[in-house]
Structures are given as C-alpha cells and as structure tokens.
Amino acid sequence: MDEKSQFSESVVQDLEQMHSALRQVMTKLSLPELPPLQSINSREEGSPPKDDHANTSHHLSVSQEEFRGPSCDNSPKATPEDEGLPYVPIHSLYTLTKLSALRSPDNPEAQKGNAINDFIARGALSLADAESLFSLYRDRLDRYMYGIGCRYMTLEELRRKSPILSAATLTVAALHDPKADNIYGICSGEFRRLMEKSMFERRIDRDYLRAMCVASYWLSDLSWMLSGYAIRRAAECNLHNSYNQAIKEQSQEAADCARLWYILYICDQHLATLYGRPSIVQEDSSIQGWEQFLKSPVATEEDKRLTGQVMLVSILRNIRELFGTDKGEPIPRVYLNHILQFRRQLDEWYTRWMGELPEQWTQIGSFPRKGTILHYNFAQIHLYSHIFRGLSNDAPIPHYFLDCAMQAVNAATAIIDLIITDPDVAVGIVGMPSYMLSMTAFACMFLIKVAVKYGSDLIERQRVHDLTTNLVRQFRSLKAGKWHLANLMAGGLERMTATLATPDLGQVQPAVYNNAVEHVDMVMPGNQVYTDMDGDTFFDYDMSFGLSPVFRFDPSMFTVDASGQSLPTYPEADYGMRPQ
C-alpha cells in the first residue's frame, strides 16, 4: 500500500470520528440529525458514491482496490527491541505486515451514529408491528435465554444501537407470535441480509454477537451455521477472556461478555448433541470456573439458571466424548460402569438445581424448575439411548443393558407426559429454545421405534400411541407462529403415530420381564418387517437409534402442514424421574 492510500484511509477514519462526535452534539441540542457520511456508505456497500459519472467511478474504484490490496494499519515502525518476545505467532506477522485482518477488530461502539436506517424506516415493516414484536421479546421470550438478549428497553434505542440485533429479535418474536405469520418472512429476510452483508466486516461489537446468540438459540434453520461463526467472531473479540476480567475487576461489561460466551458454549454443546458432531468450544477456565462466576458480585439471579446449564452441557459433552461418533458397532459391556457414573452426575445436577431454583420466576412462572425436569430427562435419554447403537433389526438387547434400555424409555415417557399434563410446561413450549423441542421430537421417535421394534417388551404400543396423540393435540392448541417447530412437528408426528395402529400380529411375546425367570440373556426382537396389504415394506426407515443424522428419520415430515401440503421455507409435583 502506498503512502497516499494510507493517508486517505487515515483521513476517512478521522472524519468518521468527527462526524460521530458532531452527531452526538446535535442530538444533545435537539437539532436535526446529520446525514450519514457518503464515504462510509461507499465502503459498506463496496461501491463508490453515486454521481453523474457512476460507471467511470466504478471502474476506477475497482482498479484502485485491486492495486491497493489488503488494508493495512498506519502505525510507527517497530524495532526488535521495542517489545518482548511475541507470545502469539500471529503478532509477528502483524508486526511485519500491519494487515488489519490479523488483529482483533476495533470496538465500533464509540463510532456509532444515531441515524436509523433499517427495514422499519424503509417501510418493509410497520412501526406498530415492530413495537408489538419487540414487547413480546422483551417482556417474555428473553427470560427463556436468561435475560441476555434484550439489552435495551425501547425499540427505538435498539434500532439506533444495532440494526442486526433488532432484526434478530423481531425475527424470533415473529416466530412465536401467531399474528405475525405474514411478517415473519420479512424479519427473517432482513436478518439474513444483514448477516450476509456483515460476514466479512472487521468491526463488530457485542450486540452483533448478541444477535447471533439470539438466532442460534431459537432459529433451528440457522443455528448450526450461526453458532460456529459466532464462536469464531467472539474469539476474535477475546470474549472467552471476559470471565477473568469480570471476576477480578467486578466489571458489569465484562460480565455481560462472559454471559454471551456461556450462551455460545451452551448452543454449541446443544447442537453437537443434536447432530452428533464435534463441538467447537473446549472447556477453558471460564467454563470450568462457572461456580466462581456465580459467587462473584457481578452475578445475578438469572445466572443461576445460566450456569446450571453450563454444568449440564459439560456433562453431555463428556458423554459424547466417551461414546464418540456412531460407527455402527455395539457398545462394549465395560461402558456400563461409565454410564452409571454419568447417571450419578446427572442425579447430582438434578438435586442441586431443583433445590436452588425458586418455585416461581418473573414472567415465566415455574418453568425454570419444570425445565430442569425436562433437561434432566433429555440428558437421560441421550445417555441411555447409546446402548442401542450397532444393534441390527434381529439383534436382541444385551441383558446387561436391559436396565439402561428401560431407563431410556422411562425418560422419553416422562418428557412427553410432562409436556401434555403440566400447564406451565405447555405454556413454555412457546418460548423454549429449539434444542428442547428437538429433543422432544427425539423422545417421540425413540418411543415409536422401540414400540415397533421390540413390541411390548419395553413399552406398549397403545401407551406410545396415546402419548404422541396427546402431544400432537397439545401442539395444535398452542398459540404460536406457523413456522414454530411445534407446529411443524405436529403433522409429522401424527403420521408417525398412525403407524402404531397397525396390528402386531406376528409379535413374539418373550418372558424377559417375568420375575420368575432368572439369568435372562436377551430380549427377543419384534417382527423385523411389517407389510401392508400389498406386501410392500411398511416400515422402511432405518430402525437403528441415535441422534445423527437428525434422528435417522425423514425430516421432511416436519415441513408440511396439517393438510399434507409442503410449507414454504424462509431464506413440587414430580413429573420426572427423580434420582433414586
């Protein structure tokens, strides 16, 4: 880069700072807002300012950009004795090249202007609709994410501070609002547009990361991609080091960053569990030191729930690391001791957090405690369902894993039973993260597969039929948006439940659970093939168990409405399994 280009870049940065300061002064004096700098718009859009010679300017801009190459920082020349030995290798390359892309991005918050130029201002979404959606998110939905997603109390402030967080917030709210079906696509499209536009933007802030946290937590169609990208960008901003600063300096700003890092960790572990893929975030001091964070002066009441989830997903992470990826091989008997150890850890987690969380919570009632029961059973079914790995259609369950098989069935049953019988949990369906709904889908499919493959050995078909039928009825009664996972799941579950009505004529009835029988070595499988009247295979999907890929059943069943038409896609009552 030549000196002239460096000088021009420095001038532009100086102008941005002066323009931002002047805007703040104008706002304080209640004077009209200044228009945005044309140079900023040009750089953001990747094109020069429009004028009478647009084509000529465009060609000149391209040639100049190609000539200049990657952007570099204009800083004093360093000498070898200026600093100590570099502790990160990339620092050496940055010292030699001054490439801007090699350093952590600047904090852009001080350079933000106050002009509002978003899809609401452009008329794509009415202000009244936006206010309604924002109120829904602020007053209710954000509590399901521990109060981390809503930093601002008014929509106007949110729009001024972060258009992308505004779009993410309104998208999630529209997903849950049954009156917002016609505007969900508008909000979702705007969020996707802003994400695409900012993919290579160097300057990001906490609200940018917060927007990706919100989307990763609720938007199942974007969560896998956004979660991984958000973790990378958060690492660039040293978000993972905020924990130490929050503890030592008792900084609320650092505590906010630490909470965002915890949410990213939770989403990462949730997605790794759902997809059976490796997680990205490893356990560092901030993850291992969640108790110190909870005891620090910066901790809030919501942090109890947050750190409780950090503790739980760390157990899930260890479970995944033990079993690894599904290679189609049976689980060795020696793993039984590990399973029992994990069971004790889950029991301890359940006992602790059921005791620490209060009966009622602001705006979401008793859902946190009932959610603890759900999460406990989600973890149980995830743990015990591994014993079905590698069992072919004619392979029995090894006798030493029979108790684990029953525990998995009991956990799945408890999940569905709690959702259909507890009114607080039923209300919480419209608000809970996509992970919880996905694990509910897994519990349903697990029971259906068990009932088909093993008949009444583990659970009666009629019991599964009744549970899933009632769950479908519960989902259809919810006041949620058309694109909410519960509505998308209802049609698919209804069709899968119908398969249980097929008579099980050839089912062999082994006496594997007869108390008079000792030293039972196996559970006899049910019919290997079910045929319809034409003799075709009735159940032709993979009957093996596992979470990857996506529960081993056709995900298209969740993308149709009640009529079977394809849905368009947009770019202390103990209901659980108390530990014994």
Where are these regions (language model features)?
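Extended, leucine-rich alpha-helical cores of fungal transcription factors
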Residues: 3-19, 86-105, 119-131, 147-166, ...
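A short secondary-structure junction motif
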Residues: 170-181, 217-218, 388, 527, ...
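The first (N-terminal) embedded transmembrane alpha-helix
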Residues: 140-144
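C-terminal, low-complexity intrinsically disordered regions in eukaryotic proteins
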Residues: 18, 27, 31, 35-114, ...
